[in-house]
């Protein structure tokens, strides 16, 4: 009976060690993904600013009218 308890404790310790390793790996991956999200967000912000600037410039441009042959 004591041997069964020791084996059970050993299996539980192995399981906990495996879970700790998995949690650490997932945490590292999450941190890397967060960096990618932040970089993507920064790019989107820059593109949005550029788009709005170009849109504003286009509104200031001469309006397109029908050519005289229409």
Curated annotation (Swiss-Prot):
Which stretch is the leader sequence? none
Which Pfam families does the record associate with it? SlyX
State the superkingdom. Answer: Bacteria
Task: Give the UniProt family note.
Answer: Belongs to the SlyX family.
Q: Which HAMAP family match?
A: SlyX
Q: What is this protein called?
A: Protein SlyX homolog
Please tell me the species this chain comes from: Rhizobium meliloti (strain 1021) (Ensifer meliloti)
Lineage runs: Bacteria, Pseudomonadati, Pseudomonadota, Alphaproteobacteria, Hyphomicrobiales
Q: Which gene encodes it?
A: slyX
